[in-house]
Amino acid sequence: TFINHKCKSSSECLPACKAAIGRASGKCINSTCKCYY
């Protein structure tokens, strides 16, 4: 699941994914966070 959160590294996505979907799992793809359920 892509969320509207710009990133430079995958670590930036973890708190964003935690807030968005309740799970701190994801990575940075094309400067956007992708979260995994």
Swiss-Prot record:
Disulfide bonds: 13-33, 17-35
Tissues where this protein is expressed: Expressed by the venom gland.
Keyword ATP-binding: no
Subcellular localization: Secreted
Gene3D superfamilies named among the record's database cross-references: Knottin, scorpion toxin-like
Similarity section: Belongs to the short scorpion toxin superfamily. Potassium channel inhibitor family. Alpha-KTx 04 subfamily.
Function: Reversible blocker of voltage-gated potassium channel Kv1.2/KCNA2 (Kd=65 nM) and calcium-activated potassium channels KCa2.2/KCNN2 (Kd=575 nM) and KCa3.1/KCNN4 (Kd=59 nM).
Any further remark recorded for this protein: Negative results: does not inhibit the potassium channels Kv11.1/KCNH2, Kv1.3/KCNA3, Kv1.4/KCNA4, Kv1.5/KCNA5, Kv1.6/KCNA6, Kv11.1/KCNH2, KCa1.1/KCNN1, or the sodium channels Nav1.5/SCN7A and Nav1.4/SCN4A.
Name under which the protein is recorded: Potassium channel toxin alpha-KTx 4.8
Lineage of origin: Eukaryota, Metazoa, Ecdysozoa, Arthropoda, Chelicerata
